[in-house]
Amino acid sequence: MMEQFQNIALYYAALFPIFFLSGLYISLSFLALTNEKIGAVYGADLVGAGAGALVMLAAMFYLHPFYLLLTLIPLWALAAKLAQYRARFEAHWWTWTSLILTVFLLSEGAAAYFIKPHFCQYKMITPALNVGDAHIRQRIHSPYGYYMVLDNFTERLDIDLSNNYILLKIQGPPKALGLYLDGNRISSFPTGAKNDLSYAKGSLDIFPYLLNPKARALLIGTRGGFRVGEALEYHAAELVALESDPNILDLIQGPLWANEKRWFQDPRVTLLRQSPGPYLAGDKRGFDIIDLSSEYLDQADANKYALTREALEDYWKALNPGGVVSLPVNIREFTVYALKLQETAREALLALGVKDPENHMMLYRSAWNARLLISKDPWTDREMGALKLFCVDRSFDVSFLPRLTPWSGEVYNDLPPTVWSAGDEQPAAAPDAGDALRDDSLQLLSERGQTFRDSHFFNLRPSTRDRPFFYSVLRLSRLQDIFKNLSQIPREEIGYLINLAVLGQSLFWALLVLILPFLGRAGRAVPWGQLGKTVVYFSCLGLGFLFIEIMLIEKGAYFLGDRTIAFSLVLCAMLVFSGLGSWLSGVIPWQLRVLLQPSGTFRPASLLRPAGLLLAVWLGLSLGPLDPVLTHCLSLSLPSRCLFLGAWAALASIPLGFFFPLGLSRLPRESSLIPWAWALNGAFSVVATPLANLLAVSVGYHSLLWLVFFLYGLAYLSFPDGPVKTAVMGRRS
């Protein structure tokens, strides 16, 4: 643990000079400017940030993530050279240029020499790389992450198979190539053109294809192509295979095509780079099987929308009569996720008007994973009997059947309850093998279900499009017990606790920045009322801008089915168009000054009113019709959806760009409040990120929009409303 804290401290030490010196440079630039130029320069800063983001995204296609620093150093060198022409000291151009060139070369050389990237020992790829015959077949640098295709004798298809190899006359998992993303294994690929698929007979996933032969199936995730081969082996009549990750698709259709083509060239198979939401919005034929691959959820962040309540509603509506949805859930560390998936399905079916939703669900499992089957029609005795026989032959366990249909009491895979003790004593182990998931499922889907959900240690609320966090079951009210059982928390839940820690840390630094003027002459030179308004105004801007950005990125991840594209598009659109708004805030007053001369005075608040009104209208539309419009537009092409998202972000960004420069123009130039305001804005922007994440997990992203309403309303009320003479805003000679 101490080693991890030391690593975090080293990251801070490495990043501190970059951001400290950048902030110092920008603050000094503001102090050197006249009021009318603040908007233009701040706009240039924002547009430059947007352009820089595009440069970094392009560099990610060619460089290892740790070496991206090499692309930044030339930009700093160029900024230093350009600063010479505004410097208040005299230096020969060749002296200054030589100094910059020397620092540039030393910095590039030091970065290339001292950066030694390696994977953490806890990453899945670390032991795989240490195998004697390990061979890296392919490396891919991408904004999506750092991909490696690994070949060694330990790599096998990661699939849940029965242990009854002899009885079923099958072999174990076939040899495969492992695909790792940032050190985590996310998929497998066949090693050759010929693959023995007999193992599929013992697979946990294959039951729907035995139940519905000659099915039209939708595969959400292909498991590197293996799922396609397995479905064809079990006589699927038509397959639509979806992959949301473009790099997986490129590997299948590129260097590994010789191993994959016998499956994907089959006329029954259609392979698309698409997420399930947009595809189902345009498909009208319906499916007999909708099958979610077990690794799909962990392959990309945007894939989390595949297990929301609304997604399950879409799957059910896309089923033909007698059709079935097959959903995976990992129970290796927690049985709780299986309960959450059942609760999500129950609420989805209730929302669709299905009476007795438990009659449409069956749950079966191995020792490590479970499958929830959701049927279009209530399960029949024949279908339930088929599942029981399937599980008995393979030593799998049935954890839930509707209508309390009797099943074998024998448990093949012991599954103890997930129990966290508030003290040091742990509950005694049961003397016989048990199925805690069966016991909990019966309570969850019974008449006592509401009491069971309310009293459960974990939060079983379904994930939704507004709260798309399937791996989020911790209750803040149980924080003390959570810390006592920290070693038992799955990796997927750690992000919630990290956000809590980062929020506390960022609040400390933000409050430190806030009190700085009160410790020096600036606090005594400026009226307390002015200081208070400055604190409120720029803190609100820092929080509000980031809340809008984070909300739009998440909306875009669902709408585009790709978080990387959504992040890039929203970030660039907001920076560029808020930069345009900032520039307009400086241009419009000077044109008004001409109209107002010689007698007039100009009030910046007169520009803030229309900007605030436009923002309020945008927020109202985002809280109201935006979600239905996004859902309606899912069937559009990806470029059309990108255009819509970019335009929607731009409509908010232009009025947002007015607030900061207009606020700076109201601060006394003889004080140090201008750099302090810049620091406040930056510090509370940092606070906004963990705070937004925690709010989204707890109450949903809509809460951020309501907070933005409040924050920008408060900022408007705290904006100084005293007139500024046009002479004060005159240009310096």
Segments from the language model and where they lie:
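Alpha-helical transmembrane segments of multi-pass membrane proteins
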Residues: M1-N163, L167-G183, S188-D205, Y209-S733
